[in-house]
C-alpha cells in the first residue's frame, strides 16, 4: 500500500508514469495552472521514501495534467498522491545564496548549513518592460586586454564563448568573476547546464582556492539529471541574478555552461510531451524557449545582467538550429584558439575570429575603434605572410613586411596577460589593465616607438610600462 506523507488542499493522484513525465488527475475545477510545481511525497510498499517535484507542462482535458520531473522518478507508481503547490518552482534569492551550490529547486547540494534566505522568487517571470530598459549601449570593462580592445562586452549584453577542451574557458570564466568582484564590487551567478559533475566539482574547488567563492552563487543541473532539471536550471540561476540586479541594484555576471545543453534538454522534454519535432529533430518551440531565457538577461535602469555563455557547436555546423538560434541573441563572440594555447599565449582568445557589435566608433570612441582596427589589420597581414615565411623564410620579405611581422609578433605577445586566478600555477601576480592603458599600449607598439624592445618583453605583462621594465631587466641579464 502507498501511504501519503503530504497533506494539502489540492491533491490529485498519478494516473501514468512515462520515464521523467507523469500524468495526474485532479478533482473537477481544481486543475493546477501551467508551470505550477507539483510535489509527490510518499512511501512505497518496499519502504522507499519518494520525494519528487514536477512542473506542469500540459492540461490534457478530463481533469488531467502532464508534468515533467525535476529529479529521478524511481519508485513512483500509479495512484500515488500529487500535491499542487499553487505556485511555480520558487528558489532562494539574495546574499544568502553567495558561496553556495544549488540544484534546480534551489536546494543546497554542497553539504553545508541550510540556506537562511529571507526571500524566495518564482523561476518563471516576464522580461523587463521596454520602459525599464537602458537604451544607450555601454562597454563593460573586464580588465582583460584582448577582450576590452577587440571584443568589448556590452553592459547587460550577451557574450558567446566558443572553445574546445583545455583551451582555458574555465580559467577565463574565473578571471571574469574575480575582476567583476574586485573592480566593480559585482557578483556572479554560474549555471552549470548539463555539466559533467567532475567539472562542477573542480570549478567549486578552484574558486574556493582562488578566493572568489564568496562573490558567486553556483547552480548545477548535471548531465545525469532528468531533462526537466537541465531545462530549468538556467532559469533558477537567472532568477538569482535578477534579484541582485533589481533589488540590490548591482551589476551581475551570469555564466551559462553550456547553452547548447539547455536546448538539448528542451528537445528531450518536447519529445516526451509528444510534440511533433521540427528541423533536425529539435523542438518546434526552440526560438520561443531561447527567447524567454535570453530576453530576461538585460540592462535596466536599476542594474545589469551581463551574460557569458559557452556555446557548443554540433559537428562544427554553425547552421545547426541550436547555435543558429543562440547567435541571434549574442552581442559579442569570444573564440578561444587551440593554436594560441599551444604557443603558450593565455588567454588564448583569437583576435581575428572574436568580434563585438559595440566595436563602433560612435560607441567606444574613435581612438579605441581605430586602434582595434589597426591591431586587426596588422595581425591579418601577419597571418597572410605566414605561408611565405614557412616556405622562403623571413629574409625574403620586403622591409615593410618585416616590420609588420615584428610588430604583429609583439602585439600577439602583448595580448597575453597574467591572471589573478592562475597566480598559484604561474607564479606571476595577476594584472587588471584599464581600457585607456590597453589602448595606449597598443598605440605605442603600432607607432613603432617600441620596435627596439625584444619580443619576450611583451609576453605575460599588464601595461606597456611593465613591458618596458621587463625589457630593461632582460637587457641587464
From Swiss-Prot:
Subunit (UniProt): F-type ATPases have 2 components, CF(1) - the catalytic core - and CF(0) - the membrane proton channel. CF(1) has five subunits: alpha(3), beta(3), gamma(1), delta(1), epsilon(1). CF(0) has four main subunits: a(1), b(1), b'(1) and c(9-12).
Organism: Synechococcus sp. (strain JA-3-3Ab) (Cyanobacteria bacterium Yellowstone A-Prime)
SMART domains the UniProt entry points to: AAA (SM00382)
Binding residues for ATP: 163-170
Protein family membership: Belongs to the ATPase alpha/beta chains family.
Descriptive protein name: ATP synthase subunit beta
Record's catalysed reaction(s): ATP + H2O + 4 H(+)(in) = ADP + phosphate + 5 H(+)(out)
Gene designation per UniProt: atpD
Keyword Disulfide bond set for record: no
GO CC terms: plasma membrane-derived thylakoid membrane; proton-transporting ATP synthase complex
NCBIfam families: atpD
